[in-house]
């Protein structure tokens, strides 16, 4: 189950709350007849929704993988101030046909531009404001059972800004796994080598360990 960042970037959706986002995901899974999840995968700010999902879903989850998780704990006032700046940054991706992507992300690869352009097109200020109001909150991380921690991977690239959250996450979930992709930037492996990234996730789900990759910090 690959958790979305949020439905605020999807056409025709309205953001109500994080709980409603989780309900939509669970309803979808139930309609598909899903009774267990081999793995939950989340990237960047999608980590916020995924962590809430993991702590509240009744579906059995065998593994979880976070790629460059946005685990910031930001005060309510700061989140309110940052909302308009974030809105214009994301909307600019649509207005510029992806031309401003390099200002937001480390790369502007043509293979990922359409997704960011679509996100910028669909985003409304009201939906983003509602999402930010109950995301990245300045409160302790939700507890994860030790057994699930032992099968959860919090991966960060050594060059990415989100690497700064690694220590706090390690303290919150001491039984988790914390691979570092040496020399890699934010989500770089899944962007540059999606087949390799998918193969890595399959290896974890099937063998319960990281594969031998040359760029994993020893």
Q: PLM ranges: what are they?
A:
Residues 2-39:
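Active-site loop/oxyanion-hole signature of alpha/beta-hydrolase fold enzymes
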Residues 76-78, 93-146:
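Conserved alpha/beta-hydrolase catalytic His-Asp/Glu region
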